[in-house]
Amino acid sequence: MLAGLSPHLSNLRRSLTQVLNFALVLSTAFMMWKGLSIYTNSSSPIVVVLSGSMEPAFQRGDLLFLWNRSPRAEVGEIVVYNVRGKDIPIVHRVVRAFGDDEKSPKETNGQKKKKVMSSGKKDSIAAGALHSDSALVSHRILTKGDNNIADDTELYAQGQDYLDRKLDLVGSVRGYIPAVGYVTIMLSEHPWLKTVLLGIMGAMVILQRE
């Protein structure tokens, strides 16, 4: 009886080993991803270019590596940001930056210098007004695709004229590998490929068992 169960136990052991190996691969990949996210301070340290708006600098399918520990994003720098309310990363270049050490362009153009009044209550009011005028704004940027005519104002959330460095940016591009991420685009645009891929993986598992 035990001899008859031996082949079944062997097959079960082999199946469990394959499941554990697969789980180990997934957990290792997840840990590496989370570790890279912590190191780069980016929720998505690796992204794929989905459109041709940054041609010729980047093509569709290019794999980008991001870094998000710099306090500022300078003009000319290529960044990745998420539009508020949407989960689609956009890769564009910074064409204007301000904040932290200067005032918002709209605020600067719309404000007038206030005269200091000479006595009592008027002095305190004027001092408060001057303090308000000199208040710094958070670092904000305006972006644009190299292959686009207009800037990204129309892409931002409703009522948003600029991106906030801390709230909107996923990271700045520090490196890339051409065309490697095109598989991701193909799977996204052609869902049936996922079924084919899963079928191939299943066939490979069955063949390995035999």
From Swiss-Prot:
GO cellular component: signal peptidase complex
Identification of the protein by name: Signal peptidase complex catalytic subunit SEC11
Subunit comment: Component of the signal peptidase complex (SPC) composed of a catalytic subunit SEC11 and three accessory subunits SPC1, SPC2 and SPC3. The complex induces a local thinning of the ER membrane which is used to measure the length of the signal peptide (SP) h-region of protein substrates. This ensures the selectivity of the complex towards h-regions shorter than 18-20 amino acids. SPC associates with the translocon complex.
UniProt-listed PANTHER family: SIGNAL PEPTIDASE COMPLEX CATALYTIC SUBUNIT SEC11
Catalyzed reactions: Cleavage of hydrophobic, N-terminal signal or leader sequences from secreted and periplasmic proteins
Glycosylation sites: 41
UniProt remark on domains: The C-terminal short (CTS) helix is essential for catalytic activity. It may be accommodated as a transmembrane helix in the thinned membrane environment of the complex, similarly to the signal peptide in the complex substrates.
